[in-house]
Amino acid sequence: MKWLVLLGLVSISECIVKIPLRRVKTMRKTLSEKNMLNNFLKEHAYRLSQISFRGSNLTIHPLRNTKDLVYLGNITIGTPPQEFQVVSDTGSSDLWVPSDFCAIEACSLHTRFRHLQSSTFRPTNRTFSITYGCGTVKGVVVHDTVRIGDLVSTDQPFGLSTAEHVSRCTPFDGVLGLNYPSISFWSTIPIFDKLKNEGAISEPVFAFYLSKDGQEGSVVMFGGVDHRYYKGELNWVPLIPAGNWMVHMDRIYIERNVIACSAGCKAVVDTGAAFIEGPKSQVDNMQKFIGARPRGSKYYVPCSVVNTLPSIIFRINSINYPVPGRAYILKNHRGRCYTTFKENQWSPSTEIWILGDVFLRLYFSVFDRGHDRIGLARAV
C-alpha cells in the first residue's frame, strides 16, 4: 500500500528523534547464579517495551531484549516525569506500574511511582486485580500524564499496584497493554486508544520488530510502518472477531504432516508471550515428532541436531509461516538445548494457540486497529 511506503520514507528523514538503545544485563546469568532461572522461565511469558524515535507521522521506540524472553523499553509518568521499564503487551489492555505504597518485596526491587511528587496526579476510589500467567497484581486506578517517547497522553488512567504476587525476579517494572478496550480489567480507555482518539498518531496502527539472538535494534512503532524492517509484502489477516488480537489459523504441519490444528483453530498474536503455546496433547505431539525428550518442566534435544530439525509451519490465511529449528530451540546456561513449545493452560477446552516472541522474531507484525487486522511479513 502506498501509505506504508510513504511512512517508511518519513521514518528515514531527519525529523526522527533517536533515543539511544541501552543494553540491559541478561537475566540468564543473574538468575542462574541464584538458582532461580527455572522459576523465571516457567512463570514468565512476557516481553517487550519502548523508548523513542519520532518522525512527523511515525513514532519508533527501541526495545531491549533480556535473555530472549522479554523486550524492555521506557515510558515516563507524572510531572516531572518518572521513568519506568515496561513490557509492551498485545495480550492485555491495561497499563500499570508499582506504587510507592507497595511495600512487599516484589515491588521493592523495582522503580515505584511517587505520586506525591507529581503535580498532575489524580486519584480515584477504584481498585483492580489482574491475573497473569505468573501471578496476580492488585492496586488502585489513578490518572496522570504518560509519555511514550514524544507521544503524550494527559490524564491517562492507569494502575498503581499495591500488591504484586508475582516472581520477585521479573526484570520489568510494569506492563503497557496494547490490546482492545474490551478486555480492559478496569474498563477505562487504554493509552493507545486515547492517543488515537486525540489525533496524536496519524494512523491507528502500531508494529513490532524483534531482533534475534540478543541483538540490539528491536522496536515498536506507532502511527505507521517502516518498511525497512521487513521483506516482501505484508500479508493481512482479519481478526476473529474484532476486539482481540486473535486470528484464524488453518493448520500446523511438519514435512506435509498435519500435527495440530487439523480442523482450523484460533491463534493469539501476543508480544507479551515468550514462547509458542497450544493444547497439551498437540504440543506433546510436536515434541514427539521432533524427537524432544522431557526433563523436568522442559523438553530437550541434542544441540548437535538443531540445524537438522524440520521447520514447523503455521498456515494462516492460506499463507505458510515456517519456524525453523534454530528459532524454536534455545540453549540454557548449561549449554543444553530445549524447545520453546508450551501448554496453553488458559484454554484447555478450546484449541487456541499463542504465537509469542519465538514466532514474532521471524515475522514483522503490524496491528491495525483501523481495519481490525494483523499484518505479517518476513523480518529483515
From Swiss-Prot:
Chief localisation class: secreted
Catalytic residues (positions): 89, 270
Residues with attached carbohydrate: 57, 74, 125
Compartments in which it is found: Secreted, Extracellular space
GO cellular component, one term: extracellular region
Tissues expressing the protein: Trophoblast and placental tissue. Produced specifically in the invasive binucleate cells of the placenta.
Hydrolase among keywords: yes
Enzymatic class: hydrolase
GO biological process: proteolysis
Domain Peptidase A1: 71-377
InterPro entries: Aspartic_peptidase_A1, Aspartic_peptidase_AS, Aspartic_peptidase_N, PEPTIDASE_A1, Peptidase_aspartic_dom_sf
The enzyme's E.C. designation: 3.4.23.-
Molecular functions (GO terms): aspartic-type endopeptidase activity
Protein name: Pregnancy-associated glycoprotein 6
